[in-house]
Structure formats: C-alpha cells, structure tokens
UniProtKB/Swiss-Prot annotation:
Gene: plsB
Comment on protein domains: The HXXXXD motif is essential for acyltransferase activity and may constitute the binding site for the phosphate moiety of the glycerol-3-phosphate.
Cellular localization per UniProt: Cell inner membrane
InterPro entries according to UniProt: GPAT/DHAPAT, GPAT/DHAPAT_C, GPAT/DHAPAT_LPLAT, GPAT_PlsB, Plipid/glycerol_acylTrfase
Major site of localization recorded for this protein: membrane
SMART domains membership: PlsC (SM00563)
Catalytic activity: sn-glycerol 3-phosphate + an acyl-CoA = a 1-acyl-sn-glycero-3-phosphate + CoA
Cellular component terms (Gene Ontology): plasma membrane
Name of the protein: Glycerol-3-phosphate acyltransferase
Enzyme nomenclature, EC number: 2.3.1.15
Family membership noted in the UniProt record: Belongs to the GPAT/DAPAT family.
Annotated source species: Haemophilus influenzae (strain PittEE)
Ranges spanned by the short sequence motif HXXXXD motif, renumbered to the chain: 305-310
GO molecular-function terms, A-Z: glycerol-3-phosphate O-acyltransferase activity
Amino acid sequence: MANFINMYRQLLSLPLSALVKNNPIPANPIEELSLNIHQPIVYVLPYTSQTDFVIFRRNCLALGLPDPAEKNEINGVKLPRYVYLDEGRRIFKSKGAKDETTTIFNKYLELHRTSESLDVQLIPVSVLWGRSPGQEDKSDLPNLRLLNGIQKTFAAIWFGRDTFVRFSQAVSLRYMVVEHGSDEKIAQKLARVAKMHFAKQRISATGPRLPNRQAMFNKLLQSEAIRRAIEDEAKSKNISIEKAQKEAYKILDEIAADVSHSSLRAVDRFLRWLWNKLYSGIDVQNSNRVRKLALEGHEIVYVPCHRSHIDYLLLSYVLYHQGLVPPHIAAGINLNFWPIGRMFRSWGAFFIRRTFKGNRLYSAIFREYLSELFHRGYSVEYFIEGGRSRTGRLLAPKTGMMSMTLQALQHSQTRPISIVPVYVGYEHVLEVDTYAKELRGAAKEKENAGLVLRVIKKLRNLGQGFVNFGEPITLSNYLSQHFPDWKEQNHEEKPQWFTPAVNNISKQVMININKAAAVNSMNLVGTALLSSRQRALSREQLLEQLSSYQQLLQNVPYSTDVVLPNVTPQAMLEHVLALDRIGVLIEKDNFGEIVRLERSSAVLMTYYRNNIQHLFVLPSLVASIILHYEAIQKDLLLDAIRKIYPFLQGELFLHFNEDELNVQIHQIINEFARQSVINSNDNFLSINKSKVRILQLWSAGTREILQRYYITVTILQKQPAISRAELEKESQLVAQRLSVLHGINAPEFFDKAVFSSFIANLKEQRYFDESSYTVLDKIEELASTLSHLISTEICLTVKGTIEKSEDLSS
C-alpha cells in the first residue's frame, strides 16, 4: 500500500508543480516561528489528502524543513513525521486515521518519558485552496472545505496561484508532558485542540461572508440612530422624510465598500507585477502578532502611518500573503474618482469626507456604518494622521476614527477590538517629488487617473518597501488598566473618561508605530550626508559614520521591534548609489572619493532622514551637549536632557518614561565611550579630539529642533503676554528668515504644526500660568539651556530678527 501511495504522489507531483505555486505562510517558518530543527518535528494535517501532501512536502523541502515523507528515528524507534486528524474525501479510502493518529501521539509521549532531552514539536499545517468567504445571501461554502479529488483538480487549475500552505506555531510535546502528564487522554486532547485550531484558522483566512450591500443598507437605514438623524434632517431643512431618506441612501452609497473576492484576486496579480516593477522586495516583520489575534477571534483595526497613496494597496497585499483577510479601508473622498474609486471600493475601500462638521446626518450614517463593520467581524484600516506626511515625520493624530472605534466598543461589541499600529516605510516614496513642491508652496495637484499613471510610468528601481506590525493595543485591556470606570453604565453619549481615553490611545498608537520603525540604507546615508553642512563627506568619513550609527542602534536599541539593516556600511552605500533618482553622487579628486548630495535633492532626502529621526534624537542630544561644552559632568548633562526631553517626546512620540530615559542616556554614553567618540571618566565626559568629526555629525540630528525651540522661547522672553496664535505666527516667520540666512533645507523647520506642538507642550509642562501668561523664570531657565547648545551666530540672528519685528510692529 505504501508503495502505491508513493507512486500516486509521484504522478500528482508533475501537474501540481506546473499548476500550484509555492506560497508558504509565513515565508520563513523556521525563523518566524522559532522552530528548532535539531529536535524531531511532527506535522499535523487536518485531513487525509495526497494532493495536499504533495504540495505541503514541496514547500517543506524548499524552506529547509525536514522532509515529511521520511520518518523520525528516536532511540532506535522509527515513527511517522506527519499525522492526519481526520479522513478526507478520497478515491482510495482507508479507515482509522483518527485512531492511527492517537496511537502515534501516544508513542511519541512514551518516548518523552524515557528521554528527558527529547522535545518533539507538533506543527499544524494546512493547505488553503482559495480564500473566498462566500456571500451572505448564498449557500455556497468557502473553498477551504474538504475537497474530493475531482474538486481538487478544478481547484488546482483555478486557484493554483492562490493556494497557500499555512504553518502554525509549534506545540512542544515536552511542555504537554510536564504540564499534563503523558497518559492516553493527552493524545486525544491534542487531536481535539488541533481540530479547533484548524477551524479557527479557516475563519481567520477567509473572514466573514461578504455582505449583500442592499440588505446592509436597508438594515442601517432602519437603525434608531439613522432614523433619528433623518427626522432631524427633515426638520432642520424643512424637507419631507422621503427626501431626507433619499439623501441618507445617497450618503451611504457614497461611503460603503462593495468588496468582490474576484476583484481582490485580480488586483493581487496586478500588485505582484507592480511591486516587482517598482521595488526589489517587501520586508514584512511581526505578522505573527496579527495572525495570533485573528486566531483568538479579535476584531482587528490596522492603524498604519501614511507615507504614500500606495500604502492602501501595500498593506492589503501584505496581509493577503500573510494568510489574513484584507481589511475594509477608510480612504479619503479625494480618491473616489473614475475609474479608481470603483476599483478601490471593490478592494475594500470605504470613503470618508475630510470633515463631518455641521452635517449630523453624514456623521450618524458614517458612525453606524463603521459600527456595523465591527459587528459583522470585518477587519478595518484607517490612517490616524488624516493625510500623508509630506515631511517624513509622524503627524499629530486625528482622533475622529479612534473616537468612533471606542463608541463601537461601548455599544454592544462582544468581540475584543485590538488596534494594530503598523510602520510602513520605503527607500523611495512615489510622491516624494510632489511633496517637495507642495512644501515649497505649490498647490496640491488633484488626484486623477492620469496623475497615477504618470507617477508609476516614470519610476522603477526604488529599493525596498517595509511593513512592520507594532505592538497591538487591546482596547478593553487598555481601558481597564487606565480608565477602570469605562464599563460602568452611563447614559451620556460621551462619559467623562471618553475624551482622555481617545487622546491617550491615539498617542500610544503613534508611539507604537515609532517603536516599530524599519531602518533602511536610504535613512542612514541620508542622515549622515544631511548632518554635514555642505551635504558632502569623504567616502571614508561616510562609512565610518554609518558604522557608528549601526553599532549604536544594535547595542542601544530604541525598542525590540525596530528593524535594522543587516548589511555592511559599504553595502548600504553601494545600494543607495544604485537607486534611481536619488541625487547621491560620487566625485573624485586627488585625495580620493567624495560622496555628495545634490542641492536639489537635499529637501527630498530630509524625508528619509525624518522617518527615523526619533531613533537618533537622544544620541544626538547627548552628542550636542558634550560637543558644545567640550567637557561636562554627567549630572549636568542629565539635567539639561530632562529639561528638553518632554518637548522631544511630545514632538517625536518617544516612548521612554523618566526611569527608562535615565537608563537609555547612560547606555548611549557607554556606547559613545566604547566607540571612543567621547572620553568617559567616572562622572566626567569630554570630547575625544581624534573622533570629534563623528561627534559633530551625531550632534546635527537635534540642531534644527533646538533652534526652533530657541526661537519660540526667545519670543516669550520678549513678549510674555503674547497670544498663542501670534506666538505660532511669529515663530514661523522668524524660522523662515533663519532658514534663508543660514541655508536650512529641512521642510519642517518653519512648519506651523511643529510650533503648535511645541507651544502645546510648553503649556502641558506649565510654562504658562492659568491666565496664559508666560512663567518667566521657567522660560528663562529653558532659554539658557538652549542657548548653550546653539551657535552664537544663530542666537544673534534669532534675537536680531525678533527685535526687528518688535520695531516694525511698534
């Protein structure tokens, strides 16, 4: 019988290799699932299927996993390396798969009694043939059901490129023996648990059935909240209920997605072609976090940072290829143009207007639609920044969508809701040229199909893309920890805890996005070149600086989620030089090679520097203080950092609390000393003159930030009663003049939003009294600290400009 099965598998192998592509999830199970291939592995499959076995085995061999067709030999005993939990629909039946599996489990458990070093790993594996969830109004089952031989043949032809082999987290048999003993009941329990796992996995891979759009509309229009809003609309505008209902239907039709699985499959092929044309690869990290939440039945809300319009497509593509359901995506109404709008809608986009203010009907409908998505179990994605970042930094969060998410949790949401922050990064952003023009004052070009095609046509060889899933926030757990009253019955629409909770969670999302930063070669090369006032370094200096960056990021990690490049500085530089349209040039003279950034590309490069500015801001501040003082006591350095840190924390969403800050600063000092960038003797720090160039380049990371802070505090010293609006305006004007006089290219240097954030942080740190008057002794102390970290030339320009402004206004 065994020989016949082997022959049958060999017959299947040739057509399947032509029809079915290798699509393992995760892409590298040994690393991502932390598998120990030096211990025996047993693959657990849901049901008997020779077709599935051939596909699964081919994936195992390609991934370097043990061959499932071979047996494990333990202490002279040979046992199968795979088991089936159930019978499949097969031409050649053989009874007793369940009993055989229980017997094999028991033999493995018996071996654990006699060998303490043994730890067999059970790995659940399933082959997913297509991922259609089916429609609500149809009785068809999703394509993950048991298929017979004829059905598998058609599935291989139709779904061959859409077939995935899903490897799940290994279960340690040693752990099971220690925790539960090794009697026969444990073997049966293992089989039961594995069956439940496969059932959950099917749901997490397909998601709930797709809705009948018309039936969903009818249900929503009959909801109490929308009926009330329709009545209010009719009264306020003096129109009939019927006319208000038509308006409500029109709004709902404008908002709602119209997901089509066949459309998703088609766009998957297009996106595969697009990524291959534009990027050399998409690096995905920590997707296991999301798969775990999906298996546990969580309602998942993806909250990525927003770099590019392509973010919408990238995250859905990545999730689909990680064995997860692409989410419903909140997209700006500006993307609802022909033909893109209809296509986006079929891929899961639902459209949102820029503002709801004054439109209670729209607000009620949108809120109920979002709540309905949560209720039905669809994952959702929205961009908390509200729009794409033109500077490469995270924008301040817009809290509207988060507020509606918490309202959905309040109102009869039974499944736990987990927010998944997502860091999205690129070595080249498609729209970066447009961003630079907009920052110079050009009008924003309206989105249209021609613009999209022009952008894509021009670009290729853009390096890598990065998607890193940050630490999830389960809302019920967060609220119970920080706002224990949240579950108390309260008939107010917004109880007292609600607004602080929305603000705190939104801020924590931004912090977790930054904790999951993916550092790439462009970020590091750009940071080093922009740190030089002439935007040029010798090749040796640049490589030395890249090495210093790399060592500090490895030895003093910002967080455990940060992803670092694992190539040499030389390889980083060569990679950047090979990218198209970057503006990094090599020039040669009698003394060697100079790496230079073209002047026209300096503003573009600040975008990539700003992506990781939060990682370098503390080392940069330490370097800046030591450089300006030349020699300083550790205590004085720490004191200066504590004064400035709250503003950096607010602006760049840093995660360190006071105790963690002290630890981080000491580690940075130790690392600089280890690299011989500074001298450290007991409580005394000083520059190392032979490495002062490295220290200078490190210090540049906070140069412009401190200059901005100094502008605002100097204005407050001169005009302690100035209004907030006037303070923002005058700070911006002084910064614009400073940028012209001193050649500062950073686009965020005179951005109104960064001044607004700094002034808000001043208020939070009590630099203003209750009547909004400046607390002068505090502001003068801060001004004194800042003035020691800024060049005399800059200080004089700032003071001179402010005095001139006072003369003109008097």
